């Protein structure tokens, strides 16, 4: 690592291999920094993944871009999650398109308890509209797993946007 001195103070720069959180202690004018894995610091971790981004606009209709809607939903979710004790990591908070491997790596490296992908789709039949929650049927947490999470999220989002819930669907291999 290195450091930079400015009028505001000293900036410490570290090159770390992996994702870490930190704790600091200032004692007798000495600064102690501990780097911890996310699981060492937080009881509950989720990864929020707004699909598309950057040059991948996703579906477009009436001037609305899927990538923008996905990101807007993620930012609204971030506002709510920032007020809880749940640690949330985001695959993107700007108009960029991370590689799929990087999106999955974030969930794996943080050892996330939940991975939530936000994705807006279209349908050939314009009378079909609403929210569909897709879950990973092979992943199970006793008492509250993928199915339960998908159900709660779909109902809550449908209620908050005064929308229509279409139900739950188990993800197929091509969805991963």
Which residues fall in each region the model found?
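Short beta-strands and strand-coil junctions in structured, solvent-facing domains, enriched
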Residues: 19-23, 55, 123
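Catalytic-core environment of secreted peptidases
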Residues: 39-64, 116
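Flexible glycine-/small-residue-rich
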Residues: 16, 35-37, 50-52, 118-120, ...
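Signal-peptide-cleaved, periplasmic/extracellular N-terminal interaction regions immediately downstream
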Residues: 1-46
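Active-site-proximal helix/loop segments of hydrolytic enzymes
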Residues: 64-176
